[in-house]
């Protein structure tokens, strides 16, 4: 039986009880970005149980319940990795490779910067784009607006690659409006 990790406290967010503050903070970050929250909705059997002829008890299935599904991306919130989790994670990787190769797995340690970093290469895959609008208007009174596949591409095209991503994360979450002269928003693509 696994030991309980110390300093992990349940937390409520929008009527849902999450098993840890990190999970609740991740749900809040996904919600602020306008992404659907799918929390622990599927159980994956990553190792099938079996019986041995010479043993009375059955070896039980090993099951894994992902913390969040964002499209076909699994987000697992882990502040601390136990030896049990390290082994189970290997079984999860093997299961996904063999059974659901289109599913992408990410483990996040915080609910903001690493979450955006994990999702950033996959916005289009999830049906989103990054809309960047300048705070300055041109001679015609229009602000520069462009859609980008990722924050990284937008930063490179705008010459901001040396700037920190943290303020942009706050802008994507609606906490801060203009960052480095631009408003950053996540926009659902219409297909």
Predicted regions and their residues:
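Electrostatic, structured charged patches in enzyme active sites and in nucleic-acid/phosphate-binding
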Residues: 1-131, 136-137, 146-175, 179-191
